[in-house]
Curated annotation (Swiss-Prot):
One GO BP annotation of this record: cell wall modification
Assembly and interaction partners: Homodimer and heterodimers.
Membrane topology qualifier: Multi-pass membrane protein
Protein name according to UniProt: CASP-like protein 7
Extracellular side: 48-72, 129-162
Keywords linked to the UniProt accession: Cell membrane, Cell wall biogenesis/degradation, Glycoprotein, Membrane, Transmembrane, Transmembrane helix
């Protein structure tokens, strides 16, 4: 009898920490999704509202730099907006995982969708980074001149908007690993 009661106590002790760890992973997943959504929203807003007009202009020509002059920066804004929307929608699934720690199929779906969104945000950040690099340094081989000496505020804002996007890339990698750990524990 004592042996049976000890075994039953051990089983209940093993089951309780598993649920606690799964719940902790789910709460961490929820928090990281909120942070990533704020980062991508901030990046999209910072880039999407960036423009600068030079103080000197002729009667017919205004020297103006806007993000939508460059397709790579438009892609950056759109991709960050899509990823932010996905992150906000995925918060519902994350709350479901907090309430119920055992759903494996929805975690597998999140891993797949998180991987797609990781690819999208990485591609957009890389494309925007190349444009920001050329804006700062130019390319003498192609006769592209650096514009950041003239459009200082524009360059600071587009450079700063990359930070949130790269934070989202790092958070997506962590989110995918957390989901895979949660799947392997079930």
């Amino acid at each position: 009898m004592k042996g049976g009661s000890i075994e039953a106590g051990e089983v209940s002790k093993d089951a309780s920490p598993r649920k606690g760890v799964a719940r902790g992973l789910s709460i961490m997943d929820f928090i990281l999704r909120i942070i990533a959504a704020v980062a991508t929203l901030g990046s999209a807003l910072a880039m999407g509202t960036t423009n600068e007009t030079l103080p000197f202009a002729t009667q017919f020509i205004k020297f103006r730099a806007e993000f939508d002059d460059l397709p790579s920066l438009v892609f950056f804004v759109m991709a960050n907006a899509v990823v932010c929307g996905y992150l906000v929608l995925s918060l519902m699934i994350s709350v479901f995982h907090i309430l119920r720690s055992t759903p494996v199929k929805s975690r597998i779906l999140l891993v797949a969708l998180d991987t797609v969104m990781l690819s999208l945000v990485t591609a957009s950040a890389s494309a925007a980074t190349s444009i920001v690099y050329i804006a700062h340094n130019g390319n003498t081989g192609a006769n592209w001149f650096a514009i950041c000496q003239q459009y200082n505020n524009f360059c600071e804002r587009i450079s700063g908007s990359l930070i949130g996007s790269y934070i989202a890339v790092a958070l997506f990698i962590i989110l995918i690993m957390l989901s895979l750990v949660a799947i392997s524990r079930n």
